Amino acid sequence: MKDRTQELRTAKDSDDDDDVAVTVDRDRFMDEFFEQVEEIRGFIDKIAENVEEVKRKHSAILASPNPDEKTKEELEELMSDIKKTANKVRSKLKSIEQSIEQEEGLNRSSADLRIRKTQHSTLSRKFVEVMSEYNATQSDYRERCKGRIQRQLEITGRTTTSEELEDMLESGNPAIFASGIIMDSSISKQALSEIETRHSEIIKLENSIRELHDMFMDMAMLVESQGEMIDRIEYNVEHAVDYVERAVSDTKKAVKYQSKARRKKIMIIICCVIPGIVIASTVGGIFA
């Protein structure tokens, strides 16, 4: 009969090599994934920093009736940078999402996949939080610009309600603000100049909000759909922690009871052995 030991050993070694190769490839893939996670996190942090800088620029512009062009240009650069970075983040998160969906479609389930899903959900939520803050900052600035326009109109003797002013802003026609204003004083001219400046700022803001609207809604819907999954994960983790704590407590109790039982057993043995020794000694003495 032919000895196939060497052949089987070679086949086993080949299988082991394949397993090692798969493990190495998987580890390399996860390393690259975590590098991507750090890159995305860095982009989100950059957006957050830019949003804070945007707030400072808003305050500087509102503090001056006629802000300098340099400050306005810096604000536009910040807004453009936020838009570019946000699009990068969205693209990378979409890529991760598609990769996860592809694996789920093949009914694959692993610890690595769960890690990637959790990281993706965390980054998506953080991204939406930052962009929500940016959106709130823009909306707040729009309201403050609108308030300044309303005050300047009052200076010229023209009173408007909030609804009327909103209609004027939505018309997109700056000439509508000059309607009915008597331009016979420097105060009226200065007021109209500031009105035009604030109106221009509002138009830029609305364009920026419009450009980011679709992306923001897309990411917000994604996070909302993930919310239930995240809540489930958190629920399971909390219950797992409770279970572990109970298990530790039960183990300590078991050890305590076991220790007491062991002491009782030793005491019983001692109680049995000592009389035995006494009896043996007595009997030995009698026979002696």
Curated annotation (Swiss-Prot):
Record note on modification: Phosphorylated by CK2. Phosphorylation at Ser-188 by DAPK1 significantly decreases its interaction with STXBP1. Sumoylated, sumoylation is required for regulation of synaptic vesicle endocytosis.
A single cellular component GO annotation: neuron projection
Topology term for the membrane: Single-pass type IV membrane protein
Covalent crosslink: Glycyl lysine isopeptide (Lys-Gly) (interchain with G-Cter in SUMO): K252, K253, K256
Extracellular topology ranges: 287-288
Parts forming coiled coils: 68-109
Subcellular location as annotated: Cytoplasmic vesicle, Secretory vesicle, Synaptic vesicle membrane; Cell membrane; Synapse, Synaptosome
Segments on the Cytoplasmic side according to the record's topology features: 1-265
Protein's UniProt keywords contain Cell membrane: yes
Classification via InterPro entries: SNARE, Syntaxin, Syntaxin/epimorphin_CS, Syntaxin_N, T_SNARE_dom
Assembly with partners or alone: Part of the SNARE core complex containing SNAP25, VAMP2 and STX1A; this complex constitutes the basic catalytic machinery of the complex neurotransmitter release apparatus. The SNARE complex interacts with CPLX1. Interacts with STXBP1. The interaction with STXBP1 promotes assembly of the SNARE complex. Interacts (via C-terminus) with KCNB1 (via C-terminus); the interaction increases in a calcium-dependent manner and induces a pore-independent enhancement of exocytosis in neuroendocrine cells, chromaffin cells, pancreatic beta cells and from the soma of dorsal root ganglia (DRG) neurons.
Function text: Plays an essential role in hormone and neurotransmitter calcium-dependent exocytosis and endocytosis. Part of the SNARE (Soluble NSF Attachment Receptor) complex composed of SNAP25, STX1A and VAMP2 which mediates the fusion of synaptic vesicles with the presynaptic plasma membrane. STX1A and SNAP25 are localized on the plasma membrane while VAMP2 resides in synaptic vesicles. The pairing of the three SNAREs from the N-terminal SNARE motifs to the C-terminal anchors leads to the formation of the SNARE complex, which brings membranes into close proximity and results in final fusion.
Protein name per its UniProtKB record: Syntaxin-1A
Organism of this sequence: Pongo abelii (Sumatran orangutan)
